[in-house]
């Protein structure tokens, strides 16, 4: 008989509503048993909205310390990830924590150290989802090197532009606030996470960023608030495998071509579509065409089921473990 896994939720924001709660509810022998939010009233309202008969609280430590909870899903802003993750692991709970991993690399290192002190517990970060279908195929082509169709990958250019800050009077978002988001900048961390899957870790980098929209309206207070997190960022990185990566991210520029990444190999060029998670390939001297994903390599969103499977089977976490999370947080140090 399969033992029921009892989940406690901390944070009732967008991803918890759209992803974590409904996906956990699909898994047999998994129960949501407790919810904590910034107030008991908001936690109770969330439970009522989704017809959940669970314990509610405005204190996350009541959920973390509950003997009725086996695993914790942390859906808060990054400013609480280190605190709640370490507390949950020390309380003997498995942890699924929202991305970005932490406020900075130091906090991420603390989280990794705590997870290593509790090897019997699963520690997982919600992964970057944009390349779920393609990453295994890309990694295979990169790893094959000269023996494969792409050859040796020497350069990668990745561009993520959306122009959301071009709207008149853009409103303050938590990602604009250093006290909530830490060193995280736009989609840089999530993009680095994907690049690391494909190519391996970053060895060194140089970067230049600027904040063009330096004030935004805080709709809670009605006041204009200073913004220090860049809304335009360019990074030139070198990976441990020798490849050079050029990042271009901006929320004050609209794309003239589709967002995505281009991998330039010695035998051809591979293009990954950010919006579609599809691939196209142009052999050297040839014409471009769709490139199929490898057989048995295409998976959609299965974050919660992967988490539960790791708890039940003790399978190692692939997407995304704390070591890989620390690697992408380390890439923020020099920016």
Predicted segments with their positions:
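Core-facing hydrophobic residues within beta-strands of well-ordered domains
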Residues: 30-32, 69, 153, 202
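Contiguous beta-strand/loop segments that form the cofactor/metal-binding neighborhood of enzyme cores
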Residues: 186-278, 305-316
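C-terminal helix-rich "cap/oligomerization" subdomain common to oxidoreductases
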Residues: 4, 30, 71-73, 109, ...
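N-terminal Rossmann-like dinucleotide-binding module
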Residues: 1-51
């Amino acid at each position: 008989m399969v033992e029921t896994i009892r989940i406690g939720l901390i944070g009732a924001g967008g991803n918890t509503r759209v992803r974590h709660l409904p996906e956990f509810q699909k898994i047999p022998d998994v129960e949501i048993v407790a919810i904590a939010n910034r107030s008991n009233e908001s936690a109770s309202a969330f439970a009522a909205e989704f017809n959940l008969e669970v314990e509610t609280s405005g204190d996350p430590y009541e959920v973390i310390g509950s003997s009725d909870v086996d695993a914790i899903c942390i859906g808060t802003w990054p400013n609480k990830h280190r605190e709640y993750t370490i507390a949950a692991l020390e309380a003997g709970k498995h942890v699924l924590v929202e991305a970005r991993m932490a406020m900075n690399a130091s906090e991420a290192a603390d989280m990794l150290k705590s997870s290593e002190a509790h090897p019997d517990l699963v520690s997982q970060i919600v992964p970057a989802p944009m390349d779920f279908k393609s990453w295994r195929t890309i990694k295979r082509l990169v790893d094959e090197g000269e023996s494969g169709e792409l050859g040796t990958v020497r350069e990668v250019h990745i561009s993520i532009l959306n122009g959301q800050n071009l709207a008149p009077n853009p409103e303050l978002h938590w990602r604009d606030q250093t006290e909530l988001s830490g060193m995280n900048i736009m989609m840089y961390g999530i993009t680095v996470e994907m690049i690391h899957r494909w190519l391996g870790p970053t060895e060194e980098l140089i970067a230049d960023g600027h904040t063009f929209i330096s004030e935004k309206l805080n709709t809670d207070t009605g006041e204009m608030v200073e913004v220090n997190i860049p809304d335009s960022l360019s990074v030139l990185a070198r990976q441990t495998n020798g490849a050079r990566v050029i990042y271009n991210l901006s929320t004050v520029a609209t794309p003239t071509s589709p967002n995505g990444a281009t991998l330039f190999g010695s035998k051809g060029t591979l293009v990954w579509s950010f919006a579609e998670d599809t691939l196209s390939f142009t052999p050297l001297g040839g014409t471009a065409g769709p490139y199929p994903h490898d057989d048995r390599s295409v998976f959609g969103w299965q974050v919660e089921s992967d988490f539960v499977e790791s708890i039940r089977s003790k399978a190692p976490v692939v997407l995304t473990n704390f070591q890989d999370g620390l690697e992408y947080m380390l890439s923020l140090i020099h920016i």
